[in-house]
Amino acid sequence: MSRPLLPRYQPTGDVVADKATWRSLVRAARRELVDGWSEADRAARAEALAQAGLQWVQEHAARAGLGLDRLTVTAFEPMRTEPPAQRLTGALRQAGARVLVPITLARPRLDWADLADPTRGPLGEAVLAQVDVALIPGLAVSEAGVRLGQGGGYYDHTLPRLHNLTAARRVPVVVVLHDHEVVPQVPADEHDAVVDAVLRPGTGVVGLGR
């Protein structure tokens, strides 16, 4: 049996230090994971994310009585060690959804651009009012749905803003991770974002408890 890529979190009483330690652990585990992938491995994971993610978004749209051509979805453009979500965003666009990707501003603010716009023209934070599904990055998530991010505070700022702007309808937030990155507990503060579900290549979309 192969060893787990991430250990069980053992709190030390210093959440700031614990977060720094865990971010280092997750980043190292990601490098180890993707360094071992062949091109076929990466393609298989990308396809799994695309199929499962698209199906889940389609089902969400159907429950809301909407076609995908009326949906706006936030996503992200992954770095090398992040889950390969490019095929998913492409599939969403091909199905008619509008896909927004973040533009990093001064901490902790994000602007947004339409992925279909090659110039990535900023649309302003108010565009979040149009979002129907939020697919977001992260480093790990607890079984309770507490997200560990990169440390910039961008999504801890953005998600409350999203929920305020879409208060009349519940916008689901799904973090996209590698298969090993759901753990019993992560180091967390009260302000850390809580998500509704996780999308992974091996499991598809799985709801997380509160």
Regions found by a protein language model. Name each.
Residues 1-125, 130:
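N-terminal active-site beta-alpha-beta segment that forms phosphate/nucleotide-binding
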Residues 1-22, 28-35, 40, 125-134, ...:
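Surface-exposed, charge/polar-rich loops and edge strands
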Residues 77, 138, 202:
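Glycine-rich, N-terminal phosphate-binding loop of Rossmann-like dinucleotide-binding domains
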Residues 79-81, 139-143:
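Short glycine-rich anion-binding loops that position phosphate/pyrophosphate groups of nucleotides
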Residues 118-121, 137, 161:
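Mid-sequence acidic-hydrophobic segments that form the walls
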Residues 154:
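A small-molecule sensor/coupling module
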